[in-house]
Design a protein with these regions (language model features):
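Basic, Lys/Arg-enriched alpha-helical interface segments
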Residues: 1-68, 77-80, 87-96
Length: 96
């Protein structure tokens, strides 16, 4: 049986911007990203498609003590591309 390899995480801008997540939020983000890397297709309440941004683009929600964080990512054939990480401050996600 062939071993399935996890898709690597690739940062769109070549850098890792670490928001001030609590330890619990870092663990939650890590677990959810690992599941995506392993090929799992997450749905609400964890992730939702962002067709307005592009094909295969999604928004991953991470709840912290006093903040709602979003990780915008795209599922490519060979990698999971992280486009942005930001604090959610409004009901609507900005298109940028």
């Amino acid at each position: 049986m062939a071993e399935r390899l996890d898709k690597p995480l690739a940062w769109l801008h070549g850098e890792i911007k670490t928001p001030p997540f609590s330890k619990e939020a870092r663990i939650e983000a890590g677990v959810l990203l690992r599941r995506i890397q392993q090929g799992e297709s997450l749905a609400l309440p964890y992730s939702r498609p962002m067709a307005s941004i592009g094909k295969r683009c999604h928004e991953l929600g991470v709840t912290d003590k006093e903040h709602e964080w979003r990780i915008v990512y795209r599922v490519d054939v060979d990698a999971i591309v992280i486009g942005d990480v930001f604090e959610k401050k409004t009901k609507k996600t900005p298109r940028k």
